[in-house]
Amino acid sequence: MAKTRPKVLSIVLAGGEGKRLMPLTMDRAKPAVPFGGTYRLIDFVLSNLANSGLTQIAVLTQYKSHSLDRHISITWRMSTMLGSYVTPVPAQQRLGPRWYQGSADAIYQSLNLINDQSPDYVVVFGADNIYRMDVDAMLQYHIDSGLGCTVAGIRVPRKDASAFGIIDADQNHKITEFLEKPADPPGLPDASDESFASMGNYIFSREALVQALHDDAHSADSRHDMGGDVIPRFVNAADAQVYDFRDNEVPGNTEKDADYWRDVGTIDAYHDAHMDLVSVEPEFNLYNPDWPIWTMQEQAPGAKFVMRGSCDDTLVSAGCIISGTDIYRTVLGPRARIERWARVDESIVMNNVAIGSNATVHRAILDKNVIVPDGAQVGVDHDHDRARGFTVSPGGVTVVGKGITVPY
């Protein structure tokens, strides 16, 4: 007799404001921010779940969710014949007229989803990191343990670990302590110079999660955060383990991108992650046919290059027209148009951006529908960029918000 597959509900936490990504999140939720030319940030977690065979997915949304809801509804239309779905679930205010108070409160206020489906296990993942992961492998690891909670952890250099939520685990991967950005992070039993950083991805046994959420909801001193409040409950009960992301094998991954994971929650991190895409041997390979990142591709003709020019180490999306210009280490979104003698380098150019003749764009992010007139400059003089109202990150990346015509 065939083994019965357990019932699994996946919940994606997509309600973050993304304040550190402003102005890219001025009019959109953080998971709806474009990435890699044609994708949205949320496409990465949804692709990982779908490729892993986990196709009953609720996406909890909150702030500025229109473009995110629309993207999910149009792009992630799964066949319902076998019970598959990806559905956006806005804040329902079941406990009164208030927003979610934290990630744990978001799930607590959405317990009807869990109660209605009555899954054996609940997968809870974040919506705004860049990585590939076979979630089913982590699920099997959780099931085999018999524990209530499994937390995905990625190995990071111990010297850099203070920037993360850190997992202290014993040699059997049982979590002994969950630390929020500790000054002296603990090393690993098998690598003293490394620490486990939490990836913000969890798998729970249903009854254990529901009980923990009820306990947290009635705790007066809780911030109602999954990592800060709920996971420590499991740790204190000796009911949590860490899943080593290094052990996760994804079909088609190269040795270089096998354990790639990036938090793109700041402008500099977002820019750096894009630069990871454009190398000859990229840090993160979008061209893996065995584990595709799914999205709705722009209905546009192929990119066109005319009047010579050069384009090196650049990702070019459909519908772009590039006319005799020099482009280097750049990601071009759909239908971008760049005129003669312009220069664009180390930049992110989103949908429908127009860059005029003799313009210069250096280490910049141009949101959709931006116009850079003939001869204008972006990213060349940061003081001038700030004077024109543009954001300049600590790492020197200039950001021009959606729909702006760049003044001289």
UniProtKB/Swiss-Prot annotation:
User: What HAMAP family does the annotation carry?
Assistant: GlgC
Q: Which GO terms describe its biological process?
A: glycogen biosynthetic process
What this protein is called in its record is Glucose-1-phosphate adenylyltransferase
The record's similarity note reads:
Belongs to the bacterial/plant glucose-1-phosphate adenylyltransferase family.
- Catalytic activity field: alpha-D-glucose 1-phosphate + ATP + H(+) = ADP-alpha-D-glucose + diphosphate
Care to name a GO molecular-function term for this sequence?
A: glucose-1-phosphate adenylyltransferase activity
Top enzyme category = transferase
Q: What is its EC number?
A: 2.7.7.27
Q: Name one Pfam family in it.
A: Hexapep_GlmU
What UniProt keywords apply to this chain's record, in alphabetical order?
A: ATP-binding, Carbohydrate metabolism, Glycogen biosynthesis, Glycogen metabolism, Nucleotide-binding, Nucleotidyltransferase, Transferase
Q: What does this protein do?
A: Involved in the biosynthesis of ADP-glucose, a building block required for the elongation reactions to produce glycogen. Catalyzes the reaction between ATP and alpha-D-glucose 1-phosphate (G1P) to produce pyrophosphate and ADP-Glc.
Q: Please tell me where alpha-D-glucose 1-phosphate binds in this chain.
A: 100, 165, 180-181, 198
Instruction: State how it assembles.
Output: Homotetramer.
Q: In which pathway does it act?
A: Glycan biosynthesis; glycogen biosynthesis
